[in-house]
Amino acid sequence: MSSSSLILLFSTLSLFLNVSLADNHTAVVITTSDTPPPLPPPSPPPRHNFTSSLMPGIAVVIAVLTAFFSLTFLLLLYVKHCKRRNGSVYVNHPQRFAITRYGGGYYNGGGVVGGRKNSGIDRSVIESLPVFRFGALSGHKDGLECAVCLARFEPTEVLRLLPKCKHAFHVECVDTWLDAHSTCPLCRYRVDPEDILLIGDCNSWFELQFSKDESNSVNNNPPGLTRFIPVSRISGRHSSAGERASRLNEIRTSSSYKSNPMSFRRSLDSSLKVNDAGEEKSESVAVNCLDRLQRKDGLLLIPNRESFEGRFEHRIIISGGNRDDQRWSEVRPSDLLYLRSEMILSDCRKLAAAEGGRDVINGRSVSELTGIERRRRWGGEPRQRQATAVISRWLAWSHRASASSIV
């Protein structure tokens, strides 16, 4: 009975399970057949990415700017290091006019000597070139100008001469030019250190005279031979093309050889031939700039070429000899000696002023806004008076010494 009851129980449970499974299947089928399946959730709208669109443009701009600055930097390096070796770039130096003072050699011939970075001339060579005062000359000298600064020469100004081409400029102007160049500012003729030999020592230059034996030998020359008397010519040059040719003619006061055979003139570019008949001839040795170097403007159509070239020539004679032969139209030895002593003492004056401290003008300021009275310090005024007295005594002594040497 127990077994039959168990069988009955299992059969009842199985039947109940079958019925329940059938009901669930029917509900699922009905549900799936009557209602549609749920739709998937919509995808979010795509957002526009501004960063991704700007990235290519930014990259292009950065690349262009990088290339531009790189080229600029390379160009600056080229100008700084390469061009300066050719002598065409100015740089600063401690002199008066912002041009570098290079040391260690000078430009000689076609190459650079001593490791110089430009084609300028050594400072010692520049300072050895002759100088003279413009006020020591007379004649048609009004309106003459410096070809570098285009300023007219004043009587108190100091000029420096280039011995070969015999062009004169302000000392500051030509020194500044020659610090970076090795040629004349006008004719571009090369200035070599050997040019100093054309001038030599000023004292020996002006004190040189014929001895009696030499004068006798000159007077006893046989007929038919010519005697060469050196003629000294030192020229100033100006850049005013509109100046009258009459003012730019050669300043020359010729002296007769018969009157005083002892007097003569040294020459840089020509010699004076005097034959036995007493006639004088001037023979050029082609050192003049216009004769030596053909300018590019030679192709210009000029009606009167000689008068045009005469506008750019102005010669100044430096003569030596007896005191009676000294002329106001010439640069005298005393002028050069006085000039050199004055230039040396001017440097001493600057040194004394520097030792006395930074002197400031005693008085009110220029703008009159501060109202602060500026006074001298460190005893600058007594030092200046002492230096002035020393300079005056030295100049008087040098002038007397030069006058006695000329006599």
UniProtKB/Swiss-Prot annotation:
It is found in: Membrane. CDD domains: RING-H2_EL5-like. It is an enzyme of class 2 (transferase). It catalyses: S-ubiquitinyl-[E2 ubiquitin-conjugating enzyme]-L-cysteine + [acceptor protein]-L-lysine = [E2 ubiquitin-conjugating enzyme]-L-cysteine + N(6)-ubiquitinyl-[acceptor protein]-L-lysine. The keyword Glycoprotein does not apply. SUPFAM superfamilies: RING/U-box (SSF57850). A zinc finger (RING-type) spans 146-188. It comes from the Eukaryota. One of its GO terms (cellular component) is membrane. It is a single-pass membrane protein. GO terms for biological process: protein ubiquitination. It holds the Pfam family zf-RING_2. The chain crosses the membrane at residues 57-77. Pathway: Protein modification; protein ubiquitination. Keywords: Membrane, Metal-binding, Signal, Transferase, Transmembrane, Transmembrane helix, Ubl conjugation pathway, Zinc, Zinc-finger. PROSITE patterns: ZF_RING_2. Its EC number is 2.3.2.27. GO terms for molecular function: transferase activity; zinc ion binding. Gene3D superfamilies: Zinc/RING finger domain, C3HC4 (zinc finger) (3.30.40.10). Residues 1-22 form the signal peptide. The RING-type zinc finger domain mediates binding to an E2 ubiquitin-conjugating enzyme. Belongs to the RING-type zinc finger family. ATL subfamily. This is RING-H2 finger protein ATL43.
